[in-house]
Amino acid sequence: MRLAPAAGERTLPGSLTLVLPAHNEDANIEPVVRRALEVLPRHAADFEIVVVDDGSRDGTAAVVEALAAADGRVRLVRHPRNRGYGAALTSGFAASRGDHVMFMDADRQFDVADLRLLAPFVADHDIVAGFRLERNDPLHRRVFAEIFNVTVRVLFGVHLRDIDCAFKVFRGDLIRSMPLQAPGALINTEIQAKARRQGASLMQVGVHHYPRVAGTATGGSLRVILRAMRETVLLWLRMHWYRPPATARKPRPPYLLGDAAMLAGVGLAAAALATLAKRRWR
């Protein structure tokens, strides 16, 4: 059944895939999917919801299987073991069929209804990226996020207000053709760094962010932060060998200022270690 768009809202051009990465979200995934089934018909006559269960140990997969059995627009992609946030998104993008691909976290900290804020810009931009108007996360996560945003700007030339905001819409052929390797949270940086090299057009739009009401957040753990630091260095190295595809609209050269910043940082760290070593052995 196809529903007409609500008055004042703009229908997205073409079809839409919503990708929902989920890990141990059995308390959240059903209301998120049902909300999407309610909202998405206002924006796209043809849409699908792809839930990627990233090795959950709870009942996430069973909940999604029941939803998929009741509505053919819902599909489940399963990872037998937990492979990471980036791997879950990559699997979801690969499984997508829409002319446009949106992703959103499945923890109820975003409302899919905010797609109405992004929809007016989708036809004219390759990427429409949300940024959190007010971030409802613990202080340590907000501090780390600000530091990380600055690091991404310096190393990769990516100027997003909120690089890790999990509310974005991409041109489908762009995101499906992009070779993605980051298994963890650095997936957003990898996407934007490669999109920049391809000359993809970008629009940023403010969206709402809500406190988590169920489940456990892991994004601010020390293990995740250390993993993100390691992946940042690896991505910086890999970007030296990345070449935009022939289909790229406006290919751009590597970001040399990022190289200078990284080398300067390494030099300062080496100098500091050398100074400490000298003091220790005096």
Predicted features along the sequence, with ranges:
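Acidic helix N-cap motif at the loop->helix transition within catalytic regions
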Residues: 27-31, 58-67
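A conserved acidic beta->alpha catalytic loop
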Residues: 53-62, 108
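Acidic donor-diphosphate engagement hotspot in glycosyltransferases and nucleotidyltransferases
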Residues: 32, 60, 89, 113-115, ...
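Conserved sequence signature across two-component system core domains
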Residues: 18, 22-23, 52-54, 79
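N-proximal low-complexity "stem/linker" segments adjacent to membrane-targeting elements
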Residues: 1-38, 44-45
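Acceptor/aglycone-binding surface of glycosyltransferases and processive sugar-polymer synthases
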Residues: 77-95, 100-103, 109-185, 211-229
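Conserved donor nucleotide-binding strand/loop of the catalytic core
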Residues: 47-50, 61-95
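Hydrophobic helical membrane-anchoring modules
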Residues: 1-14, 157, 180-282
